[in-house]
Amino acid sequence: MSEDAIGQQVPAAQEAAAGAEPNSAARERHATLSRELTEHQYRYYVLDAPTISDAAFDEQLRELAALEAEFPALRTPDSPTQRVGGAFSTDFTPVAHAERMMSLDNAFSDEELAAWAERVERDAGGPVPYLCELKVDGLAINLTYERGRLVRAATRGDGRTGEDVTANVRSIQDVPGELTPSAEFPEIPDLLEVRGEIYFPVAGFADLNAGLVEQGRAPFANPRNAAAGSLRQKDPRITASRPLRLVVHGFGARRGWAPSTQSESYAALRTWGLPTSDRWRVVPGLAGVAEYVAHYAAHRHDVEHEIDGVVVKVDPVAIQGRLGSTSRAPRWAIAFKYPPEEVNTRLLDIDVNVGRTGRVTPFAVLEPVRVAGSTVALATLHNAREVERKGVLIGDTVVIRKAGDVIPEVLGPVVELRPPEARSFVMPSRCPCCGTPLAPAKEGDIDIRCPNTRSCPAQLRERVFHLAGRGAFDIEVLGYKGAAALLDAEIITDEGDLFTLDTAQLARSPFFVNKDGSLGSNAVKLLENLTVAKERELWRVLVALSIRHVGPTAAQALARHFRSVEAIDQAGEEELSAVDGVGPTIAASVREWFAVAWHREVVRKWAEAGVRMAEEAVAQGPRPLEGVTVVVTGTLAGYSRDQAAEAIQSRGGKVTGSVSKKTAFVVVGDNPGTKAEKAAGLKVPVLDEEGFQVLLDAGPEAARAVARVEG
């Protein structure tokens, strides 16, 4: 449930029917929705234990708002559509806000956002600048400062009266007990209500739940619940022990201070010692708003806290005053809500999957549910310890998250809905595919593995599928089904047999044969693909070997340095470790891999079949980027990520995934992530794609001349 999920956009056609008299069905539905929504608000605001997702709550609330728009007689002051938050009895002392804490109306589509902006600009008399900021999914808080000293902290409550949580808020490191005048803003207001959001960092959420489970206590379903539950503790020491953070995003009552714009107020609040976000932007019109919304839709998980949308505000305070407010929300601000990425569903079972390196991973079998544009029936649980840390039982209602193309993940259980028959997951002791006893690869490993690496059908199928991928041999027709077909027909014993396949062997599998018994086009294409794959670059061969920890970057470093599989095989661990981009872990993994006899047999078979096992001898070309470290972020029109990395590395440069003071350049394409922002903060030179080409063609000095340094 979102704290500002109430003021929905109501279609004009429904407003036109404002005089309609409600029938019995409408009254009954309105009563049911009001009762259910009130219960959900109580569970959300007071118990910190909601039993439905934000998306489900928003959907019910929109239905109620539509009913009241069609039948105004049903709308009453105590309707969930008219309440800002939860006016419920709690154990905390009630305290009145000097100025009401209002909520926000929502926009769920570009059209609704555009309609809001059109009304704003019509009523304002022309275009206005907008301030865009992230909508933090946390707990709303009101901090009252008198003559610069914190005297009270209160939750939102019903907007007029909240709960006094001053003692707990004082324990949060981000909250200053006293404001400090600055040169730019030397006068601290006599009275200042600061509005903000207390959140639980995503990075600490799993550890908190693990600790609660170890203590035999119920875990939180998500970071927002963790923030609310941590703040509303009777013992402030518990609050102090948890890594709660604050971000401020506005003000209420004030005396002795009149900022001209919202953005000016943020600058003042920051200089006085209050933590404002560094991600807000002022844009001149709706196009800028749309760009900001799109950017964080793609990068919402680059942020340290959970977000569920973007808040858009008219920046000039004078225009805010002219636009005014409804009974519950300002007309000068709106929350654009992203499609939900978290939903509740039932955990039907927990099964395990065996990967290409033998790792046995538990996964959740779910009651199918629609989230983030697709239907999800499976979600990762990582390992047995993670299942225990999350505190999920088979039969639980669980919160799942799906973010874009990321594998769906189980966040935690809704303990309040746990059925009596719920049961714990027990990790199998034997491989479900080949029956081999499972064990950690070495003492202390979290993961358990099937040691039957050569013959386990699951591992072999995954390895064949992997080596056919775009990052390895790029064998187009050898997908998951094709890999399984080769194994099912016992055409190959291991991946070493792949490059000696012929038509007679493929004809043994129904997958590669037409109904009339002739060889299928996929078989012909596979043999053609295999011929082409034999000439792939050495680094792709190394990736295809499924050596643990050796991905494209490490494989390219090894290929560039040693130039043949034989040289890599003969190199010692210390020599391998010294290669830039390799290091001790990868070096040890390479040595372990080549120490296995059947691994070396795969290499021998591929070499005899004509697979390229060495780079062609070439004269050492110029290395203009020797010693230059480059970070690439976003999408480039002329280069894939791998191609950009290869272009840098072939000229002697180094590609890393994080920005630091040692970074020479950050290359920024479309939809860059937080790396671009970090580059600005560290004043690292930034290149667009045209500048990147200058770097490749003319070297670092020429690139510095066309780079921009922000911050």
Curated annotation (Swiss-Prot):
It holds the Pfam family HHH_2. NAD(+) binds at residues 54-58, 103-104, 133, 156, 197, 313, 337. It comes from the Bacteria. One of its GO terms (cellular component) is cytosol. InterPro entries: BRCT_dom, BRCT_dom_sf, DisA/LigA_HHH, DNA_ligase, DNA_ligase_AS, DNA_ligase_CS, DNAligase_adenylation, DNAligase_N. Residues 1-29 are annotated as: Disordered. This is DNA ligase. The lineage of its organism: Bacteria, Bacillati, Actinomycetota, Actinomycetes, Micromonosporales.
